[in-house]
């Protein structure tokens, strides 16, 4: 329990540092005496609560909005980096997000069988979207890779063998032409 409290305290301190320059949060801190991180955490809890109670069906749009905006922010940063470490996590996230989008075609049936679906979906999307939690990597290695590797490996092998045979044919053709050209020059 002490470890959880310590982690929570570190997260709140990190939020205070990240939003140190925000004038609205500075005003909140000045007027209330509470740290900026409390306003951010409170807004986050209120957002999740609105999704949880799903007043007027707003849970769906709020869940999808958060599921798009947060990873989109990380994706825009990843595009500008030269490393590929974050790319796998983000691609995994977008694969799972797309899967949810297809499944939600039947959202009425899902909502009938899974109450609070939008809330659970939001929590899951946060888990796989935040790189600090490593959720996307976990989902990739435990679910996506075992399901897709047999098909992708087979396709890659066929493609590689197809490329190799084309290269061999081209090399033989070039060799035959070179031999023919050399024999043609020697007969001149």
From Swiss-Prot:
Question: Where are the Lumenal topological domains?
Answer: 56-57, 106-108
Q: How does it sit in the membrane?
A: Multi-pass membrane protein
Give the UniProt subcellular location, in the record's own words. Endoplasmic reticulum membrane; Golgi apparatus membrane
GO terms for biological process, alphabetical: endoplasmic reticulum inheritance; endoplasmic reticulum tubular network membrane organization; ER-dependent peroxisome organization; nuclear pore complex assembly; response to endoplasmic reticulum stress; vacuole organization; vesicle-mediated transport
Upper lineage is:
Eukaryota, Fungi, Dikarya, Ascomycota, Saccharomycotina
InterPro entries for the chain: TB2_DP1_HVA22 (IPR004345)
What gene name is listed for this protein? YOP1
**Protein name according to UniProt:** Protein YOP1
Instruction: Write out the topological domains of type Cytoplasmic.
Output: 1-35, 79-88, 128-188
Q: Where do transmembrane segments lie in this chain?
A: 36-55, 58-78, 89-105, 109-127
Q: Which family does it belong to?
A: Belongs to the DP1 family.
- Show the GO cellular component annotation of the record: cell division site; cortical endoplasmic reticulum; endoplasmic reticulum membrane; Golgi membrane; nuclear envelope
Q: Which organism is it from?
A: Eremothecium gossypii (strain ATCC 10895 / CBS 109.51 / FGSC 9923 / NRRL Y-1056)
Kindly state the subunit structure of this protein: Oligomer.
Comment on protein domains:
The short lumenal loops between transmembrane domains 1 and 2 and between transmembrane domains 3 and 4 may impart a wedge-like configuration, thus deforming membranes.
- Compositionally biased region (Low complexity): 170-188
* Entry-linked PANTHER family: HVA22-LIKE PROTEINS, RECEPTOR EXPRESSION-ENHANCING PROTEIN
Cite the Pfam families for this sequence.
Answer: TB2_DP1_HVA22
């Amino acid at each position: 329990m002490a470890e959880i409290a310590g982690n929570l305290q570190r997260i709140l301190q990190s939020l205070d540092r990240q939003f140190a320059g925000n004038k609205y949060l500075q005003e909140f801190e000045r007027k209330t005496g509470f740290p900026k991180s409390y306003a951010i955490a409170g807004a986050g809890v209120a957002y999740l609560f609105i999704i949880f109670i799903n007043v007027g069906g707003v849970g769906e749009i709020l869940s999808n909005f958060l599921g798009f905006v947060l990873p989109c922010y990380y994706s825009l940063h990843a595009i500008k980096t030269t490393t590929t470490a974050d790319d796998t996590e983000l691609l995994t996230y977008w694969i799972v997000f797309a899967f949810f989008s297809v499944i939600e075609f039947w959202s009425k049936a899902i909502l009938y069988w899974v109450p609070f679906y939008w809330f659970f979906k939001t929590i899951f999307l946060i888990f796989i979207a935040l790189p600090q939690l490593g959720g996307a990597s976990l989902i990739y290695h435990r679910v996506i890779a075992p399901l897709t590797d047999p098909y992708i490996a087979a396709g890659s092998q066929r493609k590689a063998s197809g490329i190799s045979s084309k290269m061999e044919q081209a090399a033989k053709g070039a060799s035959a032409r070179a031999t023919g050209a050399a024999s043609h020059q020697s007969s001149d």
